[in-house]
Curated annotation (Swiss-Prot):
Its main location: membrane. It comes from the Bacteria. Pfam families: Glyco_tran_28_C (PF04101), Glyco_transf_28 (PF03033). It comes from Desulfitobacterium hafniense (strain Y51). Pathway: Cell wall biogenesis; peptidoglycan biosynthesis. This is UDP-N-acetylglucosamine--N-acetylmuramyl-(pentapeptide) pyrophosphoryl-undecaprenol N-acetylglucosamine transferase. It is a peripheral membrane protein.
Amino acid sequence: MRVIVTGGGTGGHIYPALAIAKGILAQRPDAEILYIGTREGMEARLVPEAGIEFSGVSGQGLPRKLSLETLKVGGKSFKALWETKQILKKFKPDLVVGTGGYVAGPVVLTAALFGIPTLLHEQNALPGITNKILTRFVRKVMVTFPESIAHFGVQKKLVLTGLPVRAEIGNISREKGAEDLGLRSDCLTLLVTGGSRGARSINQAMPTVLKHLAGRKDIQVIWATGKATYQETLENLKAQGIQWQRENWRVLEYLKDMPEALACADLFVGRAGATTLAEIMVAGKPGILIPYPLAAENHQEFNARALEKDGAACVILDQDLTGENLWALVQGLLEKPEKLRKMAQAARGLGQPDALNKIVNVCLDTAWK
């Protein structure tokens, strides 16, 4: 069995594609996997590091406004179609799976026109433009959120699978998670993160929250600021006279122990990227979600609203975020254990812990061999 996976531009497209590739290999060790991405994108580094064969093609995201650059990008897309055609002829795949991003367009389209079985996976509640266009050409579209189904034209092609998350998510005890982080398992724990790059608006609001929590030994804080804003955040805390090095606080540049942190957390504060939300849903954690305002087509707000609608999260728009209104929400939830419990139950009900198996089964059912 020979499979091509493709997706790129951001980690939100790359990591699901890698998870699918590894999931297929776990069930079919004899499978041959080829990842097609752009030569300049993150995938050119991440895919070989993951031990998956990589082939690069031309590609670049379309500018939001028509310009000379638009013509240049269009030229690269036509070149990518030709390059993809050559790769398909040589590799002869039994299946092509796309996870979105501009590189997936020419790869999935060319494969579909060749009659090769093709699949898409959509991570967000609001589908990306590439996946919406490709829907008419592929065999099936696997989706993460039920809310995205209405945005696709061909309903019979849609399969609700969820988004793959790390195997550790939801499978570590609260006690083990707290122990690994040097925290207590019998205290309320607030987990705050803006992702690996951080979120300046969240980092600017958090000092107010810490001021209110300074005398609270019963509430622990895990706060990952992101590498880009770590020093700036520490300087801000110092300027405000906040002693952040406390026994029950962890102010970190990057949180490498996310499964452990989620295991011992009672409340999550952060952005609303699809992978983040898939993880908090599988872990069954209530969220205060602050969608990234510059996400393509505002898809993070659509993601966040999907959880809010089902009672699993509260949403604050980035433009409305202040230290005091963040604290008001945090306090209002941490001091209402029954509400937290109901939100956690709602989040867990939305989770798809078996997402990868569902996706792999669709892949195996669709492939030629």
